[in-house]
Each structure stands twice: as structure tokens, then as C-alpha cells.
């Protein structure tokens, strides 16, 4: 236990003047300034009342100093009550007493100063001993359920330097020194009262046995020093193998007053009693002086000069919190006694005390273990019973907050629109709740999708947007304009009463309107990115599917048809790329970077989304093949890395796949639709979805990384002899508006003015427009010859974006044959006529032919 340093607390109480002092008509020598300051022998005011005698033969100011100021911890005036003194002395000490600290309160002063009145009181006005006992038992009863208490009391007096037991009167008792208990009185009786009333009865009986004799100074003068001690032993009620026991002692001491034989006119026995009283008080003063002068030095303290000081050894300078009550008289008749009392009280303030809680750990015997276990089990059972009562009676009913996500499936009439509170963190949490509702909606409509072939084609597309908010939750909230242009059908599913009860749905509709305006502003400023467009379409598709009830397939078809203007609007900024594999409506044709490809393919591959219905085993088996990389040449090792990230590599044509019948027949486009339908029905070779211009696809080159925004950038002139690393697999997701046939090639190429850059060392065609896809077989045989290529790519391909207003889309399909990579390749000789025909077409379209 840590040691706490403290000082002796000193309070001063000024008693009211007695009738004898009032009759003497002497001026008071004590003036109370405030609660802590008093002035001894203040200056006499000028112009006193006539007839009053302020002087005399024993007038103090003639011998002592004037106007002395004393500061104490507390000063009580003549009007102070017993309760006031108790509240500022023993009441605060009881807190430390119950924490295991020893405490002591003693009254010091001259005879007739009011010490016994302060400590004992009278019938109608009890003193500190009575009030302390009542307050102590009140606090013990308040802690009865937590701890077990035992109270012992003893009452003794020091009369003529002899110790007597006031509760069981007998002969003088000897005093002993115990190494563990300290100073003990041999043969002193200890009593254990059962209640506060019984303790007060014991105290009253002891006071009757105390020696009191009247003197000229005091009619009820105490001729002995009374010491009333209370011992409290407390320990926790929770049993254990080791228990902490606290034993504290409180001493309430009523000292006898110092007296002068000249004033008391004592003779015989009274004179001897007065001499012994003064002797013990003188020893007490010497102890106070020694303790005050110590200040950390090890000096001798004369405790053995008197039995009183031996009994008060631990209360004055030991492990005890001590309060000294100095009682004084305001009359000048006791001028010297009052001065001495104030002087010693002021000296006692410098006494420093070291406090330590008396806590002892006791180990229980092994024979008590069974009893301790039973007590612990009984306590656990009682606590469980209380807990059940509290939980049964005090549990608040669960509140259904409108913003909290529902754990059950959503109703049929409720659209899957999340509740969107304000704040970015709340928006991110709401996107997760939207995903859970979409998954439950997908499970509920799985039976309808199996019955309809159109739903089977759209099945994979419905699963893809379910996981899209996980890839970029910060962009999962904006929505396409088509979603918010139709708020009335969504609200129509609710009745008037449900709309009044669930305002969160109205809030969701307002947020969707805000998303519409954001989408329009971003599109007008050309700030839309492919991720944002995909997420807008994802949220649009989710809300549209939630609105469609089971069995309303006609509404779903019409809903997809209404999405055509939006798809055209989203794809109007990109150039359509012809390809022979365009069996589905067009989708997004913007550039897709590697980061976008990894973000799209990673989660879908992990989720195991099945391929589309058009996938064949022959095509699906080509994906697990290991990629074949071309060894870079010495010059290419020094080229910058940026152009390589946007290049592609051609391996072999996919026209033999058409001849083998592994791909479906090309059908003319019936009209544009949303990208979700196109993405669902496009050829897929694995659960992983790859964008159109990723390095593993076969579509023509897309714009560079600097052209991801819709506004074309003016790039500086770069080397056109760029080496492109194209994929060997067919595209997993064509992203074109329409399919163009062979008969439309001259017309289509005549409108394109972007330079076309094939691989060196073959004829280089500079043109406007995208690079035709490879369609001739046998290109894989030239792989070893292309390794020795010395062309270095120092620039990027510049493919201009034509505005949507100037772009005319042919209706027929366009199928371009694959250009030979080298004129020396024997496998390409049979296609010479096709090469010449394409070259003429390119020349007719303002193309420039260069032969290396």
C-alpha cells in the first residue's frame, strides 16, 4: 500500500462568554476575521463607551504583543453549533477511516474552554463522539451487502498518570509495547455493540465513571484525559482463497484542561490532580514541538515522558490522520491560557504525518476450501437470479429505425432503392445494404429466369452488377438519367399510407434525382470515365429489374428497349470498331485499361460466374493456355514503358474458328440497347470478363492511356514504326455499335483519316481510322521471324475520335481479313489478292502506302 503524506489538521473553536465573563465587563481578546483567520488581542478602537472598564490589573496587552494573526484550517466563532464542528472535522475523517487509515480527533485547551462540551455535549446537544458514532453506523449499514464489518470499542482514562478502564472499572492498568500492535493496554476490555443505540449506551455508562470534580474555574471540570477508541474490521463478503482484511482505529480524545492554582484555588487532592494534568500536557507540548521541529530529521520525540503521550504516539506522529480542536475563551480573564493554546495549535500545524492503509492479506486454510466453494456457488446463483429479473423487467423494446437495413427479404412492391443518409461514410454503408437487397432479389427471381430464354441470356449480366459496388463503392451511388426520369412507376408500387410511414424511400428517390443531375453535368463536361459509366448503368439495371414483378417479361423487354437512347448517348463519343463477331447489340466502346480489366475480371473469376450460352468448349479451353511472349530486341529494351502498356500482339486469326463452327452466326443488329444486355450475351470463354481493348483481346487498337477522356488530346509527332503486342485469343466482349460487311469496306474506310500502323517490315499504310482485325490464317507461323524485328516503339498510336454527329454507321456487317505480317511468310501468299484489294481500298480513302 502506498504511503500518503499529510499534515496535522488544526481547527479552533471560540466558545461563547460565560455569565462571569460578561459581568466582568472586559473586552474580548479574540476576533474572528473569517473561516480561517483570527486575530488575537486586536487594537483597541478609539473613543470607547464611557463607564466601561477595558483595562485592569491583569490586562493582557500590558504583557504580551498586540494584534497577532493566526491562520488555521478552520475557525469556528461563538455562534457555531455542534453540527458545524462535526461536519468540518470528524465527518471528513470517517472517509479515511473506512478506507483502512487510523484516525484521531482530540480537543486541547485550558480548563473551562469548552473541550468536554465539544467532544461529549449534553442531553439535547450531543457532541462529536455521539455524532461520529451515529454517522459511522449509518455508513456501515449502507455497505452491509458489500463487506462484512466487526466493530469493537474501548473507553479508558488517564488519571494522575494512571490508566483506568471506564467500561469495567478496576485497578490501574499497565501499558505495554507490542511489535505488531504497537502500544497496548494490558487488561483493557473491548466491547462489541450490536447497534448504534447500544454503543451510545456504553458511551454514556463510561462517562458516568469518569472522574469529574467542580473547581472554581469550572463547575464540571474533568480531572482526567478520556480516550474513546473504535476498532473496525472489514473484509469482502465474496469468499476467496486469499482475503484482504482492513483493521482501522479511531481515537476520540477529550483532554483535561491546563489550570492555574491561583485561578482555581485548588488545594489538597485537586491541587495534585492539577499538577498531574499539567505534567501530561507539558509532555504533550514537548512532543508537538519535537515533531514540528523534525522536518525530516531523526530527532528524539519524548513519548515516554507521560502515559498520555505514549497512548497518543500513533495518533500524533505515526500512521494516523489527526485533527486537533483547540478550544479557547474570548475573555481577557484567560488571556495567557488562550495565548498559549493558540501558540501550540499553530505549532502543531507543522507536524507531518505518514499515512498508510492497514490492509492485511490472509490465506485461508485448506479445510475451508469446500465452504468457500459453496459460498461462491450460492453467490453466483443469487446474482444470476437478479440478472434475470433485471433483464425481464428493464429490457427496452427494440426500435425499428427507418435507416437500419432489414434482415429479411424485401416485399414485392418495394423497389431495391437503398436509404441514403447524408455523409460519405453513410453513402458507403448504404451501398453495401443495396448489394444485399439485390442478391435477395436475384434469388427470388431465379425461377422466372429459368423459364424464359431471354432471362437466361441476361442472367450473367444480372450477377455482374451485384458485385460492382464492391470494386468502387464511392461511385456506386450515381445513376443514369433514365432511372430518375421514371420515378412515378417506382412510387406507384407504394400506397399512400406506406409512403407516409416510410419516408426513407422518398429520400432515396430524391437522391436518385441528384444522381441524374450529376451524371448530366459530368457528361456535359466530358469527365465521365468508363468506371463511372459502368456503375451508372449497373445501378440503372438493378432498379429496373427490381421494378419488374415476376411474370412481367414484356415490361422487362420494353424497359431494355427504352434504354437504347441512353446506350447511344453513352457510346456517341467513341468510334465504332468493325468486327466479324458482333452478334449482340452494341455496348460501351471506350478505352479499357489494364487496371479496369483486373478490377472487372478478378472478383468475377473469384465468384465463379458461368459463361454465356454462346460459349463453346473449344473456345473455353483456350483460356487456360499459357501466354506466349515475344523476346524483346536490344533496341526495344530502351524504349519507354508507356507505349507498351497500350500495345497488342497478333498471333493467329479467328476466321478458322468460324469455319469450324465454334462461333455463332453473325446476325444483323436489331437496334442499340443497354450495355448490360450486350455484356451478358457476348461470347465468353471463362468466368473472367475481359474488356474490349485489353492486351488479351483481338479487337483493333484502342486509344492510348492519355485518351481515356472524351476530349482528344493533341499529341506531338511520334515515330510511327511502333511494335504492337496483340493477343492470341478472340475478344471476350465485343464493344461495337454495328457489324459492317465486306461490301461496305470502301465506304467505311473512305471516311477514316487516322493513320493505320502495321508492324514493320511489311508495307506501312498511313490512314485515318482504326486498324482492321486480322482474319487470315497462318500468322502464327511467322512468330519466330518477328523475333528478329528491330523496330522500336517510341510513341503511341493516335486514333482520333470522331464526333457522334459526323459519324455515319453502316447497316451491313464489316468483316476485314487479317493483313499479312510479313510478305516473306509463305502462309500468306494465297491471300495476296485480298491484300491488293485492301490496299486499293485504302489508297482510295486518302491513305498513303509506304513499302519498307
Swiss-Prot record:
GO terms for cellular component: astral microtubule; cytoplasm; cytosol; kinesin complex; microtubule end; microtubule plus-end; mitotic spindle astral microtubule; mitotic spindle midzone. Transmembrane segments: none annotated. The modification Phosphoserine is found at residues 404, 452, 480, 558, 633, 639, 662, 822. Residues 390-424, 437-485, 575-594, 602-689, 767-798 are annotated as: Disordered. This is Kinesin-like protein KIF18B. Gene3D superfamilies: Kinesin motor domain (3.40.850.10). SUPFAM superfamilies: P-loop containing nucleoside triphosphate hydrolases. The gene is KIF18B. Residues 366-393 form a coiled coil.
Amino acid at each position: 500500500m502506498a504511503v500518503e503524506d499529510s499534515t496535522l489538521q488544526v481547527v479552533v473553536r471560540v466558545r461563547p462568554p460565560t455569565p462571569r465573563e460578561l459581568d466582568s465587563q472586559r473586552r474580548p481578546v479574540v476576533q474572528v476575521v473569517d473561516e480561517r483567520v483570527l486575530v488575537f488581542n486586536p487594537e483597541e478602537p478609539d473613543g470607547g463607551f464611557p463607564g466601561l472598564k477595558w483595562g485592569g490589573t491583569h490586562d493582557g496587552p500590558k504583557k504580551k504583543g498586540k494584534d497577532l494573526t493566526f491562520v488555521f484550517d478552520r475557525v469556528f466563532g461563538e455562534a457555531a453549533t455542534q453540527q458545524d464542528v462535526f461536519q468540518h472535522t470528524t465527518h471528513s475523517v470517517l472517509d479515511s477511516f473506512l478506507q483502512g487509515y487510523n484516525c484521531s480527533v482530540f480537543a486541547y485547551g485550558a480548563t473551562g474552554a469548552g473541550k468536554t462540551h465539544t467532544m461529549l455535549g449534553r442531553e439535547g446537544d450531543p457532541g462529536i463522539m455521539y455524532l461520529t458514532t451515529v454517522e459511522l453506523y449509518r455508513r456501515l449499514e449502507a455497505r452491509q451487502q458489500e463487506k462484512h464489518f466487526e466493530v469493537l470499542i474501548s473507553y479508558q482514562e488517564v488519571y494522575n498518570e494512571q490508566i483506568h478502564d471506564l467500561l469495567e472499572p478496576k485497578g490501574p492498568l499497565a501499558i505495554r509495547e507490542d511489535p505488531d500492535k504497537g502500544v497496548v493496554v494490558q487488561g483493557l476490555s473491548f466491547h462489541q455493540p450490536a447497534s448504534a443505540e447500544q454503543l451510545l449506551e456504553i458511551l454514556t455508562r463510561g462517562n458516568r465513571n469518569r472522574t469529574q470534580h467542580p473547581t472554581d474555574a469550572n463547575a464540571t471540570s474533568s480531572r482526567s484525559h478520556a480516550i474513546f477508541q473504535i476498532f473496525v474490521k472489514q473484509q469482502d463478503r465474496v469468499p476467496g482463497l486469499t482475503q484482504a482484511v482492513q483493521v482501522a482505529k479511531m481515537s476520540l480524545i477529550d483532554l483535561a484542561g491546563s489550570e492555574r492554582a491561583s485561578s482555581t484555588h485548588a488545594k489538597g487532592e485537586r491541587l495534585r490532580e492539577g499538577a498531574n494534568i499539567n505534567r501530561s500536557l507539558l509532555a504533550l507540548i514537548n512532543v508537538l514541538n519535537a515533531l514540528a521541529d523534525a522536518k525530516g530529521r531523526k530527532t528524539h520525540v519524548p513519548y515516554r515522558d507521560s502515559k498520555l503521550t505514549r497512548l497518543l504516539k500513533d495518533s500524533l506522529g505515526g500512521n494516523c490522520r489527526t485533527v486537533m480542536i483547540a478550544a479557547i475563551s474570548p475573555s481577557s480573564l484567560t488571556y495567557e491560557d488562550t495565548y498559549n493554546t493558540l501558540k501550540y495549535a499553530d505549532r502543531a500545524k507543522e507536524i507531518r504525518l505518514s499515512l498508510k492503509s492497514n490492509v492485511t492479506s490472509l490465506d485461508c486454510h485448506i479445510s475451508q476450501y469446500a465452504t468457500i466453494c459453496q459460498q461462491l456457488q450460492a453467490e453466483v446463483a443469487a446474482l444470476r437470479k437478479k440478472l434475470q429479473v433485471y433483464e425481464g423487467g428493464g429490457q427496452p423494446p427494440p426500435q425499428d429505425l427507418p435507416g437500419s437495413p432489414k434482415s429479411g427479404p424485401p416485399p414485392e412492391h418495394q423497389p431495391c432503392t437503398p436509404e441514403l443518409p447524408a455523409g460519405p461514410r453513410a453513402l458507403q454503408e448504404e451501398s453495401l445494404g443495396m448489394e444485399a437487397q439485390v442478391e435477395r432479389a436475384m434469388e427470388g427471381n431465379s425461377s422466372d429466369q429459368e423459364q424464359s430464354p431471354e432471362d437466361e441470356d441476361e442472367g450473367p449480366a444480372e450477377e455482374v452488377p451485384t458485385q460492382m459496388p464492391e470494386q468502387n463503392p464511392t461511385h456506386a451511388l450515381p445513376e443514369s438519367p433514365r432511372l430518375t426520369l421514371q420515378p412515378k412507376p417506382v412510387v406507384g408500387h407504394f400506397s399512400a399510407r406506406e409512403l407516409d410511414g416510410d419516408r426513407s424511400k422518398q429520400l432515396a428517390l430524391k437522391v436518385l434525382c441528384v444522381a441524374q443531375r450529376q451524371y448530366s453535368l459530368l457528361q456535359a463536361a466530358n469527365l465521365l470515365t468508363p468506371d463511372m459509366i459502368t456503375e451508372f448503368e449497373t445501378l440503372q439495371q438493378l432498379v429496373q429489374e427490381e421494378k419488374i414483378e415476376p411474370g412481367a417479361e414484356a415490361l422487362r423487354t420494353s424497359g431494355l428497349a427504352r434504354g437504347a437512347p441512353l446506350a447511344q448517348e453513352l457510346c456517341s463519343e467513341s468510334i465504332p470498331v468493325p468486327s466479324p463477331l458482333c452478334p449482340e447489340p452494341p455496348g460501351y466502346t471506350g478505352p479499357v485499361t489494364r487496371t479496369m480489366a483486373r478490377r472487372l475480371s478478378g472478383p468475377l473469376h473469384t465468384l465463379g460466374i458461368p459463361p454465356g450460352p454462346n460459349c463453346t468448349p473449344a473456345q473455353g479451353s483456350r483460356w487456360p493456355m499459357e501466354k506466349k511472349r515475344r523476346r524483346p530486341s536490344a533496341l526495344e529494351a530502351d524504349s519507354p514503358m508507356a507505349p507498351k502498356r497500350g500495345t497488342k500482339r497478333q498471333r493467329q486469326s479467328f476466321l478458322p474458328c468460324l469455319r469450324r463452327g465454334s462461333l455463332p452466326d453473325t446476325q444483323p443488329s436489331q437496334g442499340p440497347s443497354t450495355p448490360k444486355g450486350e455484356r451478358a450475351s457476348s461470347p465468353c470463354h471463362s468466368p473472367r470478363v475481359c474488356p474490349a481493348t485489353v492486351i488479351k483481346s483481338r479487337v483493333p487498337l484502342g486509344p492510348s492511356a492519355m485518351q481515356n477522356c472524351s476530349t482528344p488530346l493533341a499529341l506531338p509527332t511520334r515515330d510511327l514504326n511502333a511494335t504492337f503486342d496483340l493477343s492470341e485469343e478472340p475478344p471476350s466482349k465485343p464493344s461495337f455499335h454495328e457489324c459492317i460487311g465486306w461490301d461496305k469496306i470502301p465506304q467505311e474506310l473512305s471516311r477514316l483519316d487516322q493513320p493505320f500502323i502495321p508492324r514493320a517490315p511489311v508495307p506501312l499504310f498511313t490512314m485515318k481510322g482504326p486498324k482492321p482485325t486480322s482474319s487470315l490464317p497462318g500468322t502464327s507461323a511467322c512468330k519466330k521471324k518477328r523475333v528478329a524485328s528491330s523496330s522500336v516503339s517510341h510513341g503511341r498510336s493516335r486514333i482520333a475520335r470522331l464526333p457522334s454527329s459526323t459519324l455515319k454507321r453502316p447497316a451491313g456487317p464489316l468483316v476485314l481479313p487479317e493483313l499479312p505480317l510479313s510478305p516473306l511468310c509463305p502462309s500468306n501468299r494465297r491471300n495476296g489478292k485480298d491484300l491488293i484489294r485492301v490496299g486499293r481500298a485504302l489508297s482510295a480513302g486518302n491513305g498513303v502506302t509506304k513499302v519498307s
